[in-house]
């Protein structure tokens, strides 16, 4: 074998070694990228489950406030409830600490259309001389009137609102009365937070004269005289929960029924291009179906401190070059 042939064979060997090394390095980097993505997706899924549970628990917390209001009203008696009693009861609760996110707690009374004049006389004599019934849409049916709510300072605009004058609120109230269970409205715009469209809810608990929930049927309609309720603004409800806006993008939508999804909350302002991958969960919360769409942002992946496919490829390429040069 002459020198030229030997050099040619060595050159071919070096080229083959380099090519094989680069191929293996590329395959290794590609495989690592797949593993990293799978692990990152699993991490997002775990985080999404935790956050969905936190959101659900936060909303479920408000039922205890509703029970407290209901108990105070039943103790006083349907005909003896007055503004001062309701105010004094509210002073026994630290709403912002006990029920973070609730704007307050109130009482909604059923008022037959024929009894409206008498109800207004009683309400005005009860320390509210300017009390009047407000309707979002005129109607001739039974009124469901917000008679009391505390603290008044941040909810005064809601006093006198007939929630039966708007379909979303009315349907939730009817569902609560008929099922005997707590119910949420779909996304609404609170009259006391009108600048935030479809970002709020009412949570309602039915109150029956007997103090217990009657068996299913007409007895519930006969005994139900109102609801304890709380207005909820989504941003305030979620405040304080461990949702890192810089790492996770969250979109909440109401997907109850057959209609289109109604988005009611988005955290942050991450552009679609920043959302690397996502995970969607659905939860039933007091008669509503919520969709929770979580997306991982670059910071979420960075915090996982995963090995870099790029560094693996560069290291493999360097080793391949060294081997080829031997």
What is each residue range found by the language model?
Residues 10-14, 126, 140, 305:
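Intrinsically disordered, low-complexity regulatory regions flanking sensor or DNA-binding modules
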Residues 325-326:
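Heptad-repeat alpha-helical coiled-coil signal-transmission segments
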Residues 4-6, 18-28, 58-63, 138-141, ...:
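Short low-complexity stretches enriched in small and charged residues
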Residues 2-35, 314-315, 320:
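Extreme N-terminal signal-anchor transmembrane helix of membrane signaling/transducer proteins, especially
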Residues 10, 21-86, 92-102:
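Juxtamembrane extracytoplasmic/periplasmic/luminal helical "stalk" adjacent to the first N-terminal
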Residues 44-49, 74-295:
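Intrinsically disordered, low-complexity polar/acidic regions
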Residues 297-316:
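Membrane-interface helix-start motif
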Residues 4-9, 37, 41, 223, ...:
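Juxtamembrane/transmembrane-helix boundary motifs in multi-pass membrane proteins
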